């Protein structure tokens, strides 16, 4: 029998990721080289690849991508068609949604929300306290 997990939207077939032990829906794609922490969740059709990290209570869902050496941590939420790539970090209670992109060495943290078609790149830091 396939394990199921409730990601907050009902139970779906899921499994624990071998690198970190976090929950990954069977519909999501996560590389073995990525780290999914024990309380982190990846579901929907999300993609986490390369050496990306999803830690703490962070969530990556829908069609979102996290790649490269990017990190999503705290209670951060990455969803929609959002992309977090390269060495970018999303942390705290921040969210990156819709078609937003965070890449380069950019940081999005605290309670910041990046959405729509926004781009955060280079060494930019977006926070809201």
Which residues are covered by each model-predicted region?
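Intrinsically disordered, low-complexity terminal regions
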Residues: 4, 122-129
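Thr-biased low-complexity repeat/linker tracts and other Thr-enriched repetitive architectures
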Residues: 44-123
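Extended, small-residue-rich solenoid/repeat segments and analogous flexible loops
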Residues: 1-63, 67-69, 75
């Amino acid at each position: 029998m396939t394990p199921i997990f409730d990601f907050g939207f009902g139970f779906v077939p899921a499994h624990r990721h071998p690198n970190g032990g976090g929950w990954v829906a069977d519909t999501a794609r996560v590389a073995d080289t990525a780290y999914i922490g024990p309380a982190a969740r990846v579901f929907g059709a999300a993609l986490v690849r390369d050496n990306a990290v999803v830690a703490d209570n962070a969530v990556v869902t829908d069609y979102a991508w996290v790649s490269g050496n990017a990190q999503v941590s705290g209670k951060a939420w990455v969803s929609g068609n959002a992309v977090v790539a390269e060495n970018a970090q999303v942390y705290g209670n921040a969210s990156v949604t819709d078609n937003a992109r965070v890449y380069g060495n950019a940081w999005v943290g605290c309670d910041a929300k990046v959405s729509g078609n926004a781009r955060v790149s280079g060494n930019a830091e977006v926070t809201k306290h």
